[in-house]
């Protein structure tokens, strides 16, 4: 029988291999989603893309929803180090219904500060050193959930506002995706100070896909619910990701060369 000290050593090794896998470079992907409102399909589709951006540990993440009536685009350029995204710049643009609204945000970190330009204003504000943007806040969950923790809190900067988000795992669910049936964690984004008690935002994140969002749901009220469901995916398959994780685990096992 394995002695307790050896058990502890093995558990530490397994934990370190798990953390190491999620501090590795991010795997690029492109996914397409269909938007449903009150369970009815709409003509709106959304693209979610993660790709390297030309410098070491530097990435571009894009979420773009488009139909013949509107275009809504969010994108973030950020560095990824030690399981932590650090935003360089963030853009949110909306075109539709005769309106054009936008936020162009430039982050600096010495000292931590963000400058925002919008359609009618420009302002700067100090931020905490761990502040994220609205698009990359879920990436932080990769490493938190990989350790077995069920919740985390982050602050995001948006426009001239700072927002606190509390993400909590509330369930597990197997769902159908373009890659087949996958196991997911159901994560709720609990906003601090939200005046609408019935408003909820849920994300289904897949551990076997590096905690990628494969489904999202926003409940505005009893009568208005919207869902974003993945309908296409291009990137590492479940088998390729499992093989890469196993290879990484072998490298971090005690006695590995």
Predicted regions located by residue number:
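Intrinsically disordered, low-complexity regulatory regions of eukaryotic regulatory proteins
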Residues: 1, 22-23
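N-terminal signal peptide c-region/cleavage motif recognized by signal peptidases
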Residues: 18-20
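Acidic, serine/threonine-rich low-complexity disordered tracts
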Residues: 24-109, 146-257
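Short hydrophobic "helix-edge" motifs at membrane interfaces and signal-peptide entry regions
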Residues: 9-10, 169
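Hydrophobic, well-structured mid-protein blocks that either form specific transmembrane helices
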Residues: 100-145
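Positively charged n-region of N-terminal signal peptides that target proteins for export
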Residues: 1-9
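Hydrophobic helical h-region of N-terminal Sec-dependent signal peptides
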Residues: 10-16
């Amino acid at each position: 029988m394995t002695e307790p000290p050896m058990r502890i050593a093995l558990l530490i090794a397994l934990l370190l291999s798990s953390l190491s896998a999620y501090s590795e470079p991010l795997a690029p992907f492109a996914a397409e989603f269909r938007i449903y409102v009150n369970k009815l399909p709409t003509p709106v589709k959304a693209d979610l893309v993660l790709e390297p951006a030309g410098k070491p540990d530097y990435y571009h993440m894009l979420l773009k929803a488009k139909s013949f009536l509107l275009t809504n685009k969010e994108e973030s350029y950020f560095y990824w180090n030690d399981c932590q995204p650090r935003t360089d710049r963030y853009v949110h643009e909306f075109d539709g219904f005769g309106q054009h609204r936008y936020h162009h945000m430039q982050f600096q970190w010495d000292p931590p500060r963000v400058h925002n330009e919008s359609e009618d204003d420009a302002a700067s504000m100090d931020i905490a050193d761990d502040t994220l943007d609205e698009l990359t806040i879920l990436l932080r969950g990769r490493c938190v959930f990989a350790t077995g923790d069920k919740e985390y809190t982050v602050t995001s900067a948006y426009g001239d506002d700072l927002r606190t988000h509390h993400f909590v795992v509330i369930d597990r669910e197997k769902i159908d995706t373009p890659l087949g049936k996958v196991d997911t964690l159901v994560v709720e984004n609990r906003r601090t100070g939200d005046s609408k008690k019935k408003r909820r935002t849920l994300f289904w994140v897949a551990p076997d896909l590096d905690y990628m969002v494969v489904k999202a749901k926003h409940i505005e009220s009893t009568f208005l619910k919207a869902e974003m469901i993945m309908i296409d995916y291009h990137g590492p398959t479940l088998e390729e990701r499992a093989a890469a994780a196993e290879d990484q685990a072998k490298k971090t096992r005690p006695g590995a060369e």
